């Protein structure tokens, strides 16, 4: 991955965190890693853990389509690892936050 792509992704995650904070989410962790993959943001709101995948674009295409089945399965395995590591049984959901040029969309409780 080129440095410019990496920095663009970080900027998208920064924008996502600010958006979530403004919507009363508490940011618990960023870039949680396991051997299976990474979760961009782990946040909490109303006693529910939100595992949030952030996708950003400068183009004119639907960024949500960049979350494919392979990536989805890696995220699910990483969520399972998170619960094993933290010995938690909290309610949770997987969300997709799309950052467009001048728009942000939060798609909650997604499945594939």
From Swiss-Prot:
Tree of life domain: Bacteria
Annotated GO MF terms: nucleic acid binding
Pfam families per record: UPF0102
InterPro entries named in the record: Restrct_endonuc-II-like, tRNA_endonuc-like_dom_sf, UPF0102_YraN-like
Protein's UniProt name: UPF0102 protein Cla_1413
UniProt cross-references to SUPFAM superfamilies, sorted A to Z: Restriction endonuclease-like (SSF52980)
Family annotation (NCBIfam families): PRK12497.2-4
Family from the record: Belongs to the UPF0102 family.
């Amino acid at each position: 991955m080129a440095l410019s792509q990496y920095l663009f992704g970080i900027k998208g995650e920064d924008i996502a965190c600010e958006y979530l904070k403004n919507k009363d989410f508490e940011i618990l962790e960023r870039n949680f890693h396991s051997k299976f993959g990474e979760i961009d943001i782990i946040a909490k709101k109303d006693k529910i853990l939100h595992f949030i995948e952030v996708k950003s674009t400068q183009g004119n295409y639907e960024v949500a389509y960049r979350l494919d089945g392979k990536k989805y399965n890696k995220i699910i395995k990483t969520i399972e690892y998170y619960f094993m590591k933290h010995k938690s049984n909290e309610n949770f959901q997987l969300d997709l936050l799309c950052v467009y040029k001048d728009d942000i969309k939060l798609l909650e409780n997604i499945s594939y």
